[in-house]
Amino acid sequence: MYVNHETALDDYPFKTQPYEHQRVALNKGAHREAYGYLMEMGTGKSKTLLDNIGILYLSGHVNFAVLFAPKGVYRNWVSKEIPEHFSDSIPHRTIRWVSSPNATQLKEIRSVAQPFEGMTFFVMNIEALSTVKGVEALTWLGKKFGAKGLIGVDESTTIKNMKAKRTKNLIKAGQLFAYRRILTGSPVTKAPLDIYAQAEFLGPRLLGHSSYYSFQGRYAVTQKRKMGAHSFEQVVGYRNLEELSGIISQFSYRVLKKDCLDLPEKVYTVREVELTPEQTKMYNEIRGEGLTLLDGGELVSTQSIIAQMLRLQQVLSGHLKTDDGDLVTFPTNRIEELVSICEEAGGKVIIWSRFRHDIQQITQRLKQEFGEDSAASYYGDTSDDERLRIVQDFQKPDHPLRFFVGNAATAGYGITLTEANTVVYFANSFDLEHRIQSEDRAHRLGQKNKVLYIDLISPGTIDERIVKALRQKIDLGAKVLGEEAREWLRLDPKRMK
């Protein structure tokens, strides 16, 4: 049964009512075989895709969807997006891919082969498509369910490289599915050539070119460079971008926060970050020590409890200061998730962390990724003259300084940073006043856009309680006492594995 666009939206049992721009997106793309939701971060791409899937299910077109996202955040679809936004009126199940599953996880993965009267979601990390096992799984899913299936890629700039193994594998397997979707907030004009591979995943020659080199020749300005005995064409600029945008608009919908009139002035969201094995091990050791001290009556003051929480929070950021003052570091996914956010953000970004080591590492990584002049740090070590220069440069719309990396205790008061409409909390302060004041650096007189606030959270850790408390305007210094501290320390990251 085919349901036309208007009937689908009028009759669809939304779990959460869509904003007007989401209705426009669904009207344009819900029934297209290949479509892109190129919606700026904070405008609700995930909900739009889930409503799209529900509409196709009720139309009789799909009963299976495989969704891809980067490894650090793909579980967010399982724990947050699908439960919060997919219609309760549609029976559904969600199965998560794990590359090295235990017995319980393997049983869950294999359950996909069992008949199910309803909608099945199969969630995978995009990195799995660089492995034989992941490609074989997707190919099997496509052959079995693809005729009434949808394949979607969240943060689709992860497949921008046509030479990458994962991109080639996804394009090939994607054609087994009746419907294909991409989700990204990255503006096409920032890196126009990145759209080619994403469009090829949606369908061959959607951009009107049979090869990447033909596409590059039309839209890029190149110069021949020599490196030793080798010569190559280096991209030095772009052309015909208005034409390219017009072509892309035929199979996608683009919207910016500033154009979403019914969005609230402040939009809050979280990005989940998976702990590395090293972080999980150290986190559990420290929380075990804390519970032992609590049970023995040794943790009696607010200050000693907060000190224990602080050690846990350091581990979540990928480092720990020992009792001797030495700094120990751990592998972490948090900085790479931040880089993904910064890639997707259209304009300038404020990044807050309470830790000096974070600020230094973040600034260094962003400079490495986006250029030496792209990031600046504002914390205790920053001189007064440098602080003034950083704020002035950041507030200039055309200045290359895009990322303000600061400590809320130092930079959260008095300064104006309204050129940014994206604010990321890498590691929150426990101080409620620091949170309130740091939010207001972007949201104050002079801000012309909606402001998106993103908290990085590792599931099953104190991150969850910290963010919940701060958003409820609870000052943590007076809150985490007695049984409250015990409950925080009982949180187990392993429960999310």
Regions found by a protein language model. Name each.
Residues 63-64, 79, 84-85, 89-95, ...:
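Conserved P-loop NTPase motor "coupling/switch" region that bridges the ATPase
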Residues 1-2, 30-31, 42-70, 129, ...:
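Conserved Helicase C-terminal RecA-like lobe
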Residues 154-155:
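Walker B catalytic acidic pair
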